[in-house]
Amino acid sequence: MTPTPDAQAARELIRQAVSIPSLSGEEQAIAAFLRDWMARRGFDAQVDEAGNAVGVRGSGPLTVALLGHMDTVPGDIPVRVDEAGVLHGRGSVDAKGSLCTFIAAVSALPPEALSAARFVCIGATEEEAPSSKGARYAMRQHRPDFVLIGEPSGWAGLTLGYKGRLVAKVRVEKDNFHTAGDGTSAADDLTLGWQRVREWAAGFAPADSGGGGIFDRVQVTLQDLGSSGDGLTQRAWATIGLRLPPALAPYQAEEAIEQAFAGLGADLTFTGHESAVRHPKDNALTRALRVAIREQGGTPTFKVKTGTSDMNVVAELWPVPTLAYGPGDSALDHTPEERLDLAEYDRAVAVLTSALTRLVGG
């Protein structure tokens, strides 16, 4: 089936967006492109002080924030649309597909929706970096009544929450000694601490989790590990990544890591303090999306994700109905096979256009 002119314009938007390289910290070209695309279609568009591409349509009393991100991880995937109508390219799924869905849907809203609300599309910078620079700036500039986060959920999926995050950098140094003697090496001590961390994580079970799935458990991984010596001093180091459930705050995880390495002479530093978030599934926003998905022949599916997104970043300052939405399979994020079926993208745009209109009573 040949796409309508509006759908064809939406497809051209995502194809061009994916064609523009935009690593974290290098989003200037994509920001200018999105600003100009939105300005030509009636948005009040600008690139803000954080480098975000921001476009606003509508003049009503409600405010709906649609927060996506423009940056991608590294990886040069030749951009092409294959014979099956699938767009290949870095960012097609994570997460230019979602951001372009937001922009295309808002550009298609009817006058009655635009008189009921302001729709603020934000293409944020540095979501793929620990800074989340764009989201942290945007959350202090806007006070929305509803929030959509642009991350792939599949066109019929609605993501309610993401796990929290903490990164621990561990370093152990001690004087060198003869291995025939009685003692432990720096690597021994670091390994013992790591074993204690794993035991703590495996045993973590909040009373109200009912045994829960992976979303309610602590996940720990070694992201970096090494040791060295110069004949005088032994050194061992590691980076430990933690994914945190809603029942565990980052400061509580810090305390557990410190206890695990107690008495081992370890130097610990922590970064990436993000609390887990899980939003309710029955509110005006989720109801509007569920109805719109059914209109397109789908069955709405609620999800929670073990990763972390800008939903975690904005949750404290934006305590309003929130969910993440966008086309594509998140299993393809950051992979050499990243690709998005444009028919699914079309459907997501249609779903969101209908849902936003219903949400604001248009």
UniProtKB/Swiss-Prot annotation:
InterPro entries in the record: ArgE/DapE_CS, LysK, Peptidase_M20, Peptidase_M20A
Documented EC number(s): 3.5.1.130
Broad class of the protein's primary localization: cytoplasm
Keywords noted in UniProt: Amino-acid biosynthesis, Cobalt, Cytoplasm, Hydrolase, Lysine biosynthesis, Metal-binding, Zinc
GO terms of molecular function: cobalt ion binding; hydrolase activity, acting on carbon-nitrogen (but not peptide) bonds, in linear amides; zinc ion binding
Entry's transmembrane regions: none
One annotated GO biological process: lysine biosynthetic process via aminoadipic acid
Group of enzyme by EC: hydrolase
Alphabetized PROSITE patterns for the sequence: ARGE_DAPE_CPG2_1
Identification of the protein by name: [LysW]-lysine hydrolase
Organism of provenance: Deinococcus radiodurans (strain ATCC 13939 / DSM 20539 / JCM 16871 / CCUG 27074 / LMG 4051 / NBRC 15346 / NCIMB 9279 / VKM B-1422 / R1)
Gene that this sequence comes from: lysK
